[in-house]
Structures are given as structure tokens and as C-alpha cells.
Amino acid sequence: MNKNYKVVFSKARGALMVVNELTSSVQAKGTKTVIAGAVASLVAGGAMAAEPSLNGGVFNWDGAESRTSTSIYASDKQVSSVPTYANVTEVNITDGSFKPVYGSALAFAGTQKITIKNSTISGAQNSALFLNGHKGNSNVTADGFSNSIVVLDNVTIKDNQSSAGGGLYMYGKAEMTVNSGSFEGNKALSNKKNDQAYGGAAVVKSGKVFFKDVLFKDNVAEASNGYATGGAVLVDITTSIKENGKDSVGDVTFKITKDMTYTGNNV
């Protein structure tokens, strides 16, 4: 049933109130006094950010606003760190805004189906997206588990940094498709002596990535006391992941179906 509501100022409460018009009276000076019905204080800052849900291994997060680093791992993860969310087989993130104050924005490991749509990731200090199924420097045989399937639709990855990666760091058994969106202003930085900064927009150390109509702009790799490689996308063929007895090296494909200009990607 439709109802009419009016916003008034309550001197007694010192705040704005939402008042049910059908159950209110008016004092002589025109101030509404609530007798019964729906009343709610208007809180400055708007609605609370949407919370993620995890049910039966399926992780859903619509309208996310996050300022922390979130790790989401499957049960067959090949890393030892404890995740924010465990035993996740499917991830669906839509209309998100991620600005972590430390670390990566989103980290994934293990066999998962991951879909991120219409989202922005910025300000991360250890790459925006981190897909890592690798156990440090040890060899991993990937024959026993399936690929992760990753889809990014209209995702903006900008102003992130790391010594390796910048926007994206991928070192696992995965197939990724990136449709539209952009990588802008991401940096691979290193100030350590004889150290390497590699990446800028992305590092693909294993797995397959297909970029379709994705903009790359002003991504850089810089090393003040060492050396830098990359600029936009760096495909690193040194890997400790093996499949069918062979090194599982990175494989990247670009497809352009419209006019695009790539500028400012430098080492």
C-alpha cells in the first residue's frame, strides 16, 4: 500500500525525521509531532555499503565499496596464507568500487569461476588484482587441478602500483578474458639496489589472457637503483608451474574491434 512521507526538522531531537503524514499532528508553530507510524533519522553519508554473501561456495558482492584487501580462495589453493573467504568456487562481483589502503584489492587462488563487472579498482599498493596459485619458489605440477575461468567486463584498473604487476599480477593456472574497460596510470616501481620493477599495467607469468578493446594508458615501469621491464603488459616465460611435463608460460592475445589510442606506456 502506498504511503506519503514528509521530511521535517525536530527541535527536540535536533535532527531531520521522516514522518508518516497519515499519523502526525501539527503544533501551533507548524512543527510536526509524531504520534505513531514510520519514523527514521536521516543519517549523513547515505546508505551503508553492500555486504558480500557466501553460500555453498558461491561468493556474491553487488555494489561493493571496500577499502581493505580481500582474499578469496578455493579449497585447492596452492598458497599457504589464510584468506578472508575460504572454499569459494564461484565469485560474482558487480558495480564495485575498491580503494584499498594497503595490499591488493582482490586476491584469488585455486580453481574458481570469477566474474567482475562494471567495477573500478584503484590505489592498491600490491597490484589491484592478484591471481596466484603458486607455492613460492617451489615447482607446482598443475595436471591435478582445473583452470580458473576469469572474466572482467568493463572494469577500470587505475593508479595502482607494485614492484611486480601494478594493475594485474597473474601466476596460476587460469584463463582470463578482459572485455572493454581500461588499465590507466598503474606503476611497477622499485627503489632497491639491483632490484627489478616489472609490469606496469600487468604481469602474466602463466595462464592465458585475452584482451578485447581494452585501453592501456600511462602505465609505467620504473627502477631507480635497478632495472625495469614492461610498461604495459609483461609476459614472463620463466615459471615453476608445469603442465603435461612442460612449463606453463604466459599466453596473451589482443583483439581490437574499434578505434583506440594507446599512449604513455613507458619503461
Where are these regions (language model features)?
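Gram-negative bacterial Sec-dependent N-terminal signal peptides
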Residues: V8-A49
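Short acidic, Pro/Gly- and aromatic-enriched capping/linker segments at domain boundaries
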Residues: M1-K6
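Surface-exposed loop/turn motifs in large extracellular/passenger domains
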Residues: P52-Y102, L106-N126, L131-Q161, Y169-K193, ...
